[in-house]
């Protein structure tokens, strides 16, 4: 077995399959593009689903990749086991209807055992297979595997409900009896017992059958197109080759661990039970790559995952004694380890470090807040005579504030409290079940559309044409090829001026005419067929025949509006880079007829001043009437020109570059104006957050922009009339004066409310009652608003009248309830929660003051009567 670095292992895998005629697919972003079923790219095949389901036909049916992936369902196991990671790399080879079982198995055996490649000892490799899959068993024997090293496993069948399915075969490496102290042997494999001896390194899935839950598996029909989907974990492979005890004892993690040693002053050992080194090393990799790919920490979705990873890493840093912020300092090390194949971490190093540093600083403040919550929780539990923190409370501290159970336990033990570990496990499992249920499982292929996949005719899109003569080559009706169509159908022509929806630009609409100039069909939509042809969805008014020539005419007014928005999107993107920063990467776009919508990565709201400058800059470029050039070239030349490749887009060898003067240059396959002046005008309508670390700008151009400005002008005129401002320029002064008058009136109102409260207080405070050792006042009062209740409570606080005050009032149709307490034995927040249901309300607050709102005034007498009972 050869000695290799992780970079060499990755490269050897790709080189091998390249030598077998595979195209190397570049690793895609961890943030899925146009796939709402995934939170993260979580496997090597996840970015290739479009090929397996037939929606797109690859230029080469043989593919290979090294794909970064994230899975966080079992985050708690990271650091505890030898091989759990949140971010990992999958090496894979894939066949889309090309080779199948025989070649896939032969390739795997050659790569692993040949002296030209990895040169694993054959006697160290064991194979599992599906018992009924005799073809796989026989093929392994044919390539040279000892039959005693072939282990049948009933679970070796890949299936998710109805649809593509098939057997899989897994390759394991035997690390020897040193990792099998009880000498269990092959039983570990046969009975699927968790162990460190037999390490799975490669799984080959044979997508062969069309599963149907209604019939036995043995009767599943075969798929018309059989596919191969394989996955090899790079971290496991490197661990075996480099002889590491765990995946962390390799060149993928050790440089990070060495930096953590310097920060903590503690020496790492593979035999040490201290998992903190491993947790930090794992999590900083995930954070660096995910943030580099445009995800940002937040409170939901993938942003929540990142925030949780960061907080977990910080807490483990504290366990190692690391003081202050430290995580960002590890990013350059991650970048250097991965730079040979993933240069983006070093390229975006400053931005990644800035985000991590800011988030860590925020969390350090959160820790202080969490400490206060724990203290408050313990005080309340003591008051209630309890000596145990319930699992639900532990989980809330863990889930919301990132407090590990160990830290909560340590703080609790200092105060003499026990921990409800079982309750915590129940809450944790419930969350994990919810997380797993939320994941829509997907496999290596979906339903295959044979009709669309069979269309291989040549068809060309004519960028410059608005109308063209075209021959009808293919007609599809109800998913079948036909020679003549009526009604709704899908058509492919030899050429077309109709743009197919792509890259955020909506499709062209228009009409189809016959040789006599009569309209015979309306084009409602245009999409790309699997082989790339423009597929026209139409509603016919007369029959259309394959082989005949028709005139295709786009709706020019619609196209004009769309291209204005598309070119303006390029200008907006450039302006964002100039004003907000280069980290403002496109995360989605839509160029419609009425508006443009642009999503971009940014960690804060764009300020009013920034929006004004963006709008000004875009309009300035529009009025300069810069030429919009389109250049067709190869991808390497385009990158040398400085063309920006957009987020999530995949480009072939030849690309179109859209260059707008010296202001903007991007790779783009869409249609555009000829000059910027044709856009006319640009107006931002809205800026908002749409998710963790993603902002959205909605804007309009041309006539729609003029209408937006006109609407604003009309609104301003109406406001001027309302505030009696002769000119629009005087509105601000008028409104400012009105605000001053309102403040003065409010001040006077507050003074009157205070006097009213004082006048009532003497009468209210006379009625002091007792419930056991607690004195209290409970009264219904008349106040103009909730502030009136607070005013009365303030007066009560200044006097030694009673331990507890309960005030209730009807304000409009609502009921307001206030509870105040000076007694350490009575928590206002708890009491208000007990009383609020009497008026169909709810509320809460602090131990000394709490409020609630309700809707049932009829319950007030019963509420007041219940006070004594609740305090007794």
From Swiss-Prot:
GO terms for molecular function: alanine-tRNA ligase activity; aminoacyl-tRNA deacylase activity; ATP binding; catalytic activity, acting on a protein; transferase activity; tRNA binding; zinc ion binding. SUPFAM superfamilies: Class II aaRS and biotin synthetases, Putative anticodon-binding domain of alanyl-tRNA synthetase (AlaRS), ThrRS/AlaRS common domain, Translation proteins. Keywords: Aminoacyl-tRNA synthetase, ATP-binding, Cytoplasm, Ligase, Metal-binding, Nucleotide-binding, Protein biosynthesis, RNA-binding, tRNA-binding, Zinc. Its main location: cytoplasm. It holds the Pfam family DHHA1. Zn(2+) binds at residues 566, 570, 668, 672. Its cofactor is Zn(2+). One of its GO terms (cellular component) is cytosol. It catalyses: tRNA(Ala) + L-alanine + ATP = L-alanyl-tRNA(Ala) + AMP + diphosphate. It comes from the Bacteria. Binds 1 zinc ion per subunit. Gene3D superfamilies: 2.40.30.130, 3.10.310.40, 3.30.54.20, 6.10.250.550, Bira Bifunctional Protein, Domain 2, Threonyl-trna Synthetase, Chain A, domain 2. It is found in: Cytoplasm. Its EC number is 6.1.1.7. GO terms for biological process: alanyl-tRNA aminoacylation. Catalyzes the attachment of alanine to tRNA(Ala) in a two-step reaction: alanine is first activated by ATP to form Ala-AMP and then transferred to the acceptor end of tRNA(Ala). Also edits incorrectly charged Ser-tRNA(Ala) and Gly-tRNA(Ala) via its editing domain. Consists of three domains; the N-terminal catalytic domain, the editing domain and the C-terminal C-Ala domain. The editing domain removes incorrectly charged amino acids, while the C-Ala domain, along with tRNA(Ala), serves as a bridge to cooperatively bring together the editing and aminoacylation centers thus stimulating deacylation of misacylated tRNAs. Belongs to the class-II aminoacyl-tRNA synthetase family. This is Alanine--tRNA ligase. It comes from Lactococcus lactis subsp. cremoris (strain SK11). The gene is alaS.
